[in-house]
Amino acid sequence: MFIAMNRFKVVKGEEKAFEQIWSSRRTRLEEMEGFVSFHLLRGPEREDHTLYASHTMWETKASFLAWTTSQQFRDSHKDAGKNKPLYVGHPEFEGFDSVLEQINTTRDAAAEAAL
């Protein structure tokens, strides 16, 4: 599993605009082999910004790298430069290889038992 994250420092008062950009953007992630899931995360508020992170899970790092060179990536990022006034600084990328995974298998069993 590979996790790709970008951290965004969003100017205070621009949170709704930032979230709207993400909710209305066509990412085409589902077209990519190895794509698992995406989350937009809102973090703590600071004096001049609110921290957000885009969190994308991939089956492999190679799957993620294929995304970054794909037409789908170019299409989904084509208007990114228009949003610079929403940010304090530039987005910061972080990539992580999973070295340990724990899955809650009891949740599914409990749900089935309740049926």
Where are these regions (language model features)?
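Glycine-rich beta-strand-turn "strand-cap" elements at beta-sheet edges
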Residues: 2, 39-48, 78-115
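A sequence-composition feature that detects small, non-aromatic residues
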Residues: 4, 17, 53, 62, ...
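Short secondary-structure boundary micro-motifs
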Residues: 11-12, 23, 28, 39-41, ...
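An amphipathic, aromatic/His-enriched active-site/gating alpha helix that lines ligand/cofactor pockets
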Residues: 20, 26-36, 57-94
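Coiled-coil-like amphipathic alpha-helices with heptad-repeat character
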Residues: 2, 20-21
